Each structure stands twice: as C-alpha cells, then as structure tokens.
Curated annotation (Swiss-Prot):
Keywords: CBS domain, GMP biosynthesis, Metal-binding, NAD, Oxidoreductase, Potassium, Purine biosynthesis, Repeat
GO-annotated biological processes: GMP biosynthetic process; GTP biosynthetic process
Cofactor(s) needed for function: K(+)
Annotated coiled-coil segments of the chain: none
Function: Catalyzes the conversion of inosine 5'-phosphate (IMP) to xanthosine 5'-phosphate (XMP), the first committed and rate-limiting step in the de novo synthesis of guanine nucleotides, and therefore plays an important role in the regulation of cell growth.
Tagged with keyword Membrane: no
The enzyme's E.C. designation: 1.1.1.205
Catalytic activity as recorded in UniProt: IMP + NAD(+) + H2O = XMP + NADH + H(+)
Subunit structure: Homotetramer.
Domain CBS: 138-194, 201-258
UniProt keyword annotation of Repeat present: yes
Name of the protein: Inosine-5'-monophosphate dehydrogenase
SMART domains per UniProt: CBS (SM00116), IMPDH (SM01240)
Length: 545
C-alpha cells in the first residue's frame, strides 16, 4: 500500500515537471509581449489588474537568420509625422541634459535635442535662436551690427552666438562693410570700449553675391577670394542674406545632420499647458523652433490634451510639429492621437532619477508601456517615442522592436561634455550633476518663478517646503563628448539589427522576437565571475549599483 502511494506521488511530480517544461519552452518561442503575457503561470486576475508589465531587463531578443551587414543598416526614422532623422535618438528636455550646446551636437549627429523649459520664455527662445543660427545653408536674417557700435559690444554679441564676425549695415540695411576676428586680431582689448566698428571694419573691395546665388557659385566665390563670409545683396545694396564657409565644412563633417529645408539644424523645445504656456509656445515658434513638446508627467490630463489640440488648430503653428507626452498605456496614446499629436512620447517613471512609481505608486514598466502605446500609434501612422529607462544600447533595440520609432535619452547623455550639468570631482573621478525635473532642485524657484512645478501639477504650491518631489538629484560619470557616446550607442543598435536580421528600423518589429528571462538569466547576461580592470566604452557596471 505504501509503495503504491509513493508511485502515485512520483507520477504526479513527473507530470508537473513536464507541464513546467512545456510552459518554459513556449515562452522561449514567444513573438511579442501579448504572447508573453498570455503564458503567465498564474490564475486569471480580476479586471482591476492589468496584464503583466515588463521592463527592458526582463527580456532579450532572439537571434535570427540574417543577411544584414552592421555597417550597412539604415537607422533613419520618423521623429514626427513630417520630420525624419538619420539617428533614432532625442536628448531629454531636462535642465542637466539639454540646452543649446547639446541640441546643436544632437542635430549634427543625426538626432535632435529638446530644450528644457525650466527657464524664462526669453531665455528659452534665445536658446532656439542659437541653435538655428549655429549653421545654415544660407542665413536669410543674419545678425548685423551698426557702424557706431563699440568693439566691446561687438565682442559680447559674437561671444553670445559663437560667431567670428558680422556684416555691417546702415539704418536702411545697406551693406557698408564687414568685420571679422581678423580685423580685431591686433587691437588691444583695453581699446575695445573706445574704438567703434567703423574704425576697423573692412569696407573696401567687399566680396558679395546676388540674393539668388547657387550653392556651387557661392563656394567658388569663397574659395576664389579666400574669404570666410559671403554677404548677399540685392540690386540696391540691401543685405538679404549671408553664406559662411564653415557651413560647407560642417556639411561635409556632419553628413547625417538633422536639418530643415533652409539647411539649418532642427531643434525641439518643451512647453507646458498652464499659465504663460501659450506665450512660451508663440515665442518659441517665432524663434524658429521645429518641434514643440507638450511636456507633462501625465499626458492624459485634459489640459494637456487641450493644449495639443489648440496648437494643432492654430494656423500660426502650421510649420511646427507637436509631440505629446507622457503616457504609459494604449488608451493614453490614443487620446494623444485624437488630440492631434504628431508623435507620442511614452514613459511614466522609468527614468533613473524619477520616483513617480514609488511616491505616487503609478507607472507602467517601460517595455510594456512602449508596446501598448505603439499599438495605437502604428494604426494611426503616428511615431512613438520611448522616453526613459535606457541603460545600454541593447535597450534601444528592445524599444524599437516593441514598436517605438525613436528613444529619448536623459541619464545616458547627462555625463556628456555638452550637457549643462556641473562637472564635479569625486573620489578621483569626474562626474556631472544630473537631476529629475520633479526633484526639489529642479522645482525650486528661478528668480520669482518656478518653471518646472506645473509639469507635476504643483504650480499652485507656493512654498518650497510644501512641494512633493517626484525625482532625485545625483551625479553620473563624466563620459566625454557626445559624438563618442552616440557612436557606441548607435553601434550597438547596428549590431542588434544584424543579429535579428533587420535592414532598417521599420523591419525591427517584424524581425525581432522577445524571450522573457529570469533574474539568473539577467545576471548571466552581464559580465560575471571577473574583476573588471578596464571598462569598455559601451559598458559600465554603474547602472547595476
């Protein structure tokens, strides 16, 4: 009798092993997150529970048959309905990540920067202007200087816009000369306050071109006369434009740069939806911004959706694309689309400096959030931007396979030279300050106003000690110039496209298949059983601490 009982127990145990093995095998063969969710070993949950939420670290991509060469893949993608980028990356609208220097570097490397809004309207509009003037096929409204201006004032103007010289015009906008750093090279700085532009400018034998000059003819004139700036004038001598030799050099140096129809670098900027948000949006539009990002912690807020709709229905903003965010669900993305958004930004709390999921208990693990939102976006032909949670280049690939068109990077870029965060030395290593826009520091007043509190719906909180933060402040390792960081991040994406057999971004959701992994699988994926002596440029254990 005892033997028969043992036999039955043994048979039941074997059956359980077979059942678990079959389940494990089916998970390995899953093609998308819906299938992964359906394979849960748990009993069905009541309706109040959503499906299983997965983060990037919960999955890997399965290798696939491939004829792809990593160096030949096409990483171009739609940022919005109308704007295409060569690299599927944006820098985050954070005050320790993106100001004009980062935005310029991002656009030159094929992505785009989103200027943060934690500053005055005039200052943010000036940042847009700096980016748009940084290079151009032809500057149609060049900065100019009056002959009566002192060299001291001229020097300040050139320093502000990082330029080496300016056309000199009279009150009727007629060209009367040009002044460059060559004209000022041998003038003592103590004379800058007394000498005027007219005293040192070049006014004889000016090399100019007609308003309708071709690019090739302009290049020929610059080379023939060995000058760096070519003012363009009409028949009456009025200044109509300016072409510089540096723009030809930069076009060759940065062939994948994200540019507008006039050859200027593209730039995006964040706006809110309360208070002076409309005045901010209007000022940014007048400064030449290409994309406005209606930037809030919960994109499903009625006021945020109304702001998107208002911008899309105002003809003054016809030349500006509108991105809405952030959302974490399919229904949230659908609401953005119905409001008229040209792209939807996805991410509720995945960032390394965000505490929303802990403080508010709200959020969606990022891989699931991207996958769900992408279902609505794909059906409507609207690009989806995965914002946050990217630690390594492999995470970019996972986001794109899940349906994102591009990714937004914050902490990954905060350590770059171009990021505005302060550089500090800690234990003999260099770091840069990085903070969430929901941190106490970011929401603190700047002068008489706080520009970040309304992102977290706390604009009505007048006392700093009453603010409920949804972010933290810290430091990230200094990583050097942006182009080196992006080279490694995009290089990893190229390798991923090779492994899954995708020639371009559009093929990634079709070719990519996820396998869900355990904690042991994640540990096995990272370097293990070794003491690292030299860090690779694309891998650091920093995120695992």
């Amino acid at each position: 009798m005892r033997c028969r009982t043992r036999q039955r127990i043994s048979e039941r145990s074997q059956a359980c092993v077979v059942k678990v093995s079959a389940c494990s095998y089916s998970v390995c063969m899953a093609t998308n997150l819906d299938e992964l969710n359906a394979q849960s070993a748990y009993a069905p949950l009541p309706p109040i529970f959503a499906k299983l939420g997965l983060a990037y670290d919960d999955v890997l991509l399965l290798p696939n048959e491939t004829d792809v060469i990593p160096s030949e893949v096409d990483t171009s993608t739609h940022l919005t309905r109308k704007i295409v980028m060569k690299a599927p990356v944006l820098s985050a609208a954070m005050d320790t990540v993106t100001e004009s220097e980062m935005a310029i570097a991002m656009a030159r490397n094929g992505g785009i920067g989103v200027l943060h809004r934690n500053l005055s309207i005039d200052d943010q509009a000036a940042q847009v202007d700096v980016v748009k003037r940084s290079e151009s096929g032809m500057i149609t409204d060049p900065l100019t200087v009056n002959p009566e201006v002192t060299l001291a004032d001229l020097d300040k103007l050139c320093g502000k816009f990082h330029i080496s010289g300016l056309p000199v015009v009279d009150k009727e906008n007629k060209l009367v000369g040009i002044i460059t750093n060559r004209d000022m090279r041998f003038i003592a700085s103590e004379d800058y306050d007394t000498l005027k532009v007219k005293d040192v400018m070049t006014k004889e034998n000016l090399v100019t071109g007609p308003s309708n000059i071709s690019k090739d003819d302009a290049h020929r004139l610059l080379a023939q006369h060995k000058v760096e700036k070519l003012p363009l004038v009409d028949e009456e001598g009025h200044l109509t434009g300016l072409i510089t030799v540096k723009d030809f050099v930069k076009t060759e140096q940065y062939p994948d740069a994200t540019k507008d129809e006039q050859g200027r670098l593209r730039v995006a900027a964040g706006v809110g939806f309360l208070g002076d948000a409309w005045q901010r949006a209007s000022a940014l539009m007048e400064a030449g911004v290409d994309v406005l990002v209606v930037d809030t912690a919960n994109g499903e807020a009625r006021l945020a959706l109304d702001m998107i709709s208002r911008l899309k229905h105002d003809s003054a903003f016809d030349g500006v694309q509108i991105i809405g965010g952030n959302v974490g669900t399919r229904s949230g993305a659908q609401a953005m689309i119905e409001a008229g958004a040209d792209a939807v930004k996805v991410g509720i709390g995945p960032g390394s400096i965000c505490t929303t999921r802990i403080v508010a208990g709200v959020g969606v693990p990022q891989l699931t959030a991207v996958y769900e939102a992408a279902q609505a976006c794909r059906a409507a032909g609207v690009p989806c931007i995965a914002d946050g949670g990217i630690h390594y280049s492999g995470d970019i690939a996972k986001a794109l396979v899940a349906g994102a068109s591009s990714v937004m990077l914050g902490g990954t870029l905060a350590g770059c030279e171009e990021a505005p965060g302060e550089k500090v030395l800690l234990h003999g290593k260099q770091y840069k300050l990085y903070r969430g826009m929901g941190s106490l520091g970011a929401m603190a007043p700047r002068g008489k106003k706080s520009y970040s509190k309304d992102r977290y719906f706390q604009a009505d909180v007048t006392s700093s000690d009453k603010v409920v933060p949804e972010g933290v402040e810290g430091e990230v390792p200094y990583r050097g110039p942006l182009n080196a960081v992006l080279y490694q991040m995009l290089g990893g994406l190229h390798q991923s496209m090779f492994y899954i057999g995708a020639h371009n971004i559009a093929e990634m959701p079709e070719r990519g298949k996820f396998i869900r992994i355990t904690d042991a699988g994640l540990r096995e994926s990272h370097p293990h059983d070794i003491v690292m002596t030299t860090e690779a440029p694309n891998y650091s254990g920093f995120h695992n601490n």
